C-alpha cells in the first residue's frame, strides 16, 4: 500500500510539475514592456503572433486584470488569462497581438466608488468624469498602437475580469466605436453608460451566481441596460461559481472563436 501511495504521489507531482512548466512557458511568450508618456508609465506585457510579420495586419486584444493583480512588478497581471491566449492551440487558431497592461496598486481601471465594508462590495460608477490615471494611459496607449500598420483596426478587442470587467465596460463607454467585440467577467458598471455602445459592440458577459465579492446583480443590470438600448449580449451566469467565474469563462469552447469572428465595419 505504501508503495502504491508513493507511486501515486510521484505521478501527481509529475503532472503538477509539467503543468507549472507549461504555464511558465506560456507566460514567457509575453515580453515586458512599458508605455511612457511625460512622467507617467504604464507597465504591460506583449505577446506577438507566431512568426510575426510586420508587413501583415493582425487583430489586437487588450486584457484587463482584477484588483488582486495590481502592482508594479509587470508580472501579476499574467496570473489569469495568459494561458488562454498563450496556449499553443489558440496561438495557431487565433494569431493576434495580445496586451496585458498592469494597473498600479493605488489606482483602478474604472472610475468607481468602492465600499469594501460590505459583502458583496458596494459599487457606484459616476458618469462623465475624467478617467483614472491608469485608464487615461490605457486610452493613450490604445491610440498609439492603433496607428501601427500591423494592427487591424477593424479587429480590436477588449476583455477583463472583476476590476478589469469594470474597466472593460468603462472603456466601451469612452470608445464606443472602437472595439469589434468585448467580454466582461464578474464585472460591474453603470447601466446608463450602455447606451453609448449597446448597438455597436457585441459583448459576452459572465458572472458566478454565488459571487460574494461583486454581486451578480451588477452584470444582470448591465445586460439589461444593453438589451434596453438595442444590443444583443451573450450572458453566462454560472450557478455554482463564486467570484472566480473566469475559470468557467476561459473554459468556454466558443469564447475565442466568437470573439475573433467579430469585425468592426
PLM ranges: what are they?
Residues 1-27:
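Bacterial Sec-dependent N-terminal signal peptides
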Residues 185, 193, 202-265:
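C-terminal catalytic histidine-bearing segment of alpha/beta-hydrolase fold enzymes
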Residues 69-135:
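Active-site machinery of serine-nucleophile hydrolases
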Amino acid at each position: 500500500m505504501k508503495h502504491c501511495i508513493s507511486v501515486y504521489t510521484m505521478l501527481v507531482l509529475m503532472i503538477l510539475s509539467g503543468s507549472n512548466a507549461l504555464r511558465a512557458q506560456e507566460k514567457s511568450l509575453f515580453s515586458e514592456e512599458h508605455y511612457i508618456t511625460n512622467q507617467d508609465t504604464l507597465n504591460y506585457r506583449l505577446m506577438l503572433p507566431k512568426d510575426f510579420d510586420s508587413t501583415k495586419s493582425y487583430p489586437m486584444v487588450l486584457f484587463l486584470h482584477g484588483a488582486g493583480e495590481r502592482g508594479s512588478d509587470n508580472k501579476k497581471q499574467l496570473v489569469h488569462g495568459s494561458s488562454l491566449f498563450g496556449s499553443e492551440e489558440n496561438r495557431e487558431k487565433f494569431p493576434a497581438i495580445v496586451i496585458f497592461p498592469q494597473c498600479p496598486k493605488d489606482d483602478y481601471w474604472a472610475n468607481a466608488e468602492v465600499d469594501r465594508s460590505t459583502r458583496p462590495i458596494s459599487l457606484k460608477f459616476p458618469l462623465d468624469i475624467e478617467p483614472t490615471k491608469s485608464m487615461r494611459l490605457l486610452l493613450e496607449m490604445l491610440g498609439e498602437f492603433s496607428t501601427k500598420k500591423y494592427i487591424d483596426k477593424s479587429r480590436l478587442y477588449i476583455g477583463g475580469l472583476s476590476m478589469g470587467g469594470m474597466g472593460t465596460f468603462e472603456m466601451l463607454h469612452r470608445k464606443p466605436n472602437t472595439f469589434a467585440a468585448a467580454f466582461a467577467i464578474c464585472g460591474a458598471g453603470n447601466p446608463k453608460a450602455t447606451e453609448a455602445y449597446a448597438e455597436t459592440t457585441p459583448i459576452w458577459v459572465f458572472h458566478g451566481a454565488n459571487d460574494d465579492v461583486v454581486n451578480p446583480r451588477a452584470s444582470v443590470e448591465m445586460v439589461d441596460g444593453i438589451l434596453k438600448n438595442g444590443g444583443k449580449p451573450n450572458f453566462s451566469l454560472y450557478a455554482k461559481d463564486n467570484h472566480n467565474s473566469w475559470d468557467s469563462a476561459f473554459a468556454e469552447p466558443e469564447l475565442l472563436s466568437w470573439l475573433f469572428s467579430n469585425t468592426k465595419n
